[in-house]
From Swiss-Prot:
This is Triosephosphate isomerase. The keyword Cytoplasm applies. It comes from Janthinobacterium sp. (strain Marseille) (Minibacterium massiliensis). It is found in: Cytoplasm. Substrate binds at residues 9-11, 172, 211, 232-233.
Amino acid sequence: MRRKLVAGNWKMNGSLAANTLLLTEIKSGLGNATSDVAVCVPSPYFAQCQGLLNGAAIALGAQDVSSHEAGAYTGEVSTSMLQEFDCRYVIVGHSERRAYFAETNELIAQKTVRALNAGLTPIVCVGETLDQREAGQTDSVVAEQLNVVLASIAASDLAKIVVAYEPVWAIGTGKTATPAMAQEVHAMLRKQLQAKNAEAAMQVRILYGGSMKPENAKELLAMSDIDGGLIGGAALKAADFLAIVHAA
């Protein structure tokens, strides 16, 4: 039985005061959550959030990482820097990184390998746009995104990754993916993972990242191949985030 994972992605949001309030509320409302919980915060807040999460059953995560080990790469953050703040997870290949920063499947694969080599758990994001969805290209696009990553890692490392499906077409467009539609893609991803390592594929958690909210979390999380959520907007509101955590 795969333990659910609810990971909040704060994106480019937060402040010292707001972070303190948000994490204090989340910690106090966590109770005996049966899922794993993580927050992926902007890098300037690593030290603050590390302190706020001390002793809490909430893991710290990053929103991106460099494909390089160290050196003259202005603005980049390395895996060794993440390790110093006890980061456990790192998001790679988020749809916003692909769209706004021209990240390729190959670069995302390099970041995945870099994270694994550092003992971090990469949350590998895949997903299709509205145009791709309407052209019937969902399976081919998502499969190719994951294939490039899978080709870059050892079969023995498969169980060390997390996959997140982000239907880009369902984020901020007014369109929604039903639980059945999400499950269909998650099942396809699971089958793809099984081709790499059948046993490990059953351990890999596949998160749903298409605007999971308190209103739809329970239905989505009831699907057999939806193992948690990568939460955007709802992660910035303690009550909403906690509702999703407890739905898991």
